[in-house]
A protein has these predicted regions:
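Short glycine-rich phosphate-binding loop at a beta-alpha junction
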Residues: 58-69
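Short alpha-helix plus adjacent loop in nuclease-associated cores
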Residues: 78, 84-132, 169-170
């Protein structure tokens, strides 16, 4: 595989930790130096991860879009000059053999180093907030409907036939 990025970082993202693997070597080298470490996912720890990555003069950072866990990492890292590449997990084949977070991070770094990871769509902050609010509104409406239905059941079991007189008891 042809090397596209001499110094890059692959990150395996989880709820409570991120595993970073930096591959550093010339474009002609198939044996780059490897630096690996694990950080937590608090703001302070993510900033420490960013500092560690910048100390190694990384130019490209590759990570998977794992649930919502990638968003805090992206928010903190996007303030830097790093080229951030969010990968769809389905497009990154699993590591052959035994699966570990360290191997996953290295595999992501290797694929990214060779330019084999395509950038996923990253919505703007406004779109992300609108999606969140829309989903939240839908969940509130669904809960309200469940509560109303439950009240109807309670009234019927108590032989209170209020719905015979009112079309909507919640107006």
């Amino acid at each position: 595989m042809q090397v596209m990025h001499p110094v890059c970082c692959g990150i395996d993202v989880h709820q409570k930790s991120i595993v970073c693997c930096i591959l550093d070597g010339p474009l002609t080298s198939n044996e780059p130096k490897k630096y690996q470490t694990t950080f937590g996912t608090t703001t302070k720890e993510l900033k420490a991860a960013l500092d560690w990555i910048l100390e190694h003069q990384v130019t490209h950072v590759f990570f998977e879009s794992t649930g919502q866990y990638w968003i805090p990492l992206f928010n903190i890292f996007s303030d830097s000059d790093l080229e951030l590449v969010l990968a769809n997990p389905q497009h990154i084949k699993n590591v052959p053999g035994r699966k570990t977070d360290v191997k996953d991070a290295e595999w992501i770094a290797q694929l990214g180093r060779c330019g084999l990871i395509n950038q996923s769509y990253i919505p703007s902050q406004e779109v992300l907030q609108l999606r969140y609010l829309t989903r939240y509104r839908l969940s509130v409406k669904q809960r309200l409907t469940q509560i109303k239905n439950h009240i109807h059941v309670i009234l019927q079991r108590a032989n209170i036939k209020i719905t015979s007189y009112l079309t909507d008891i919640f107006c």
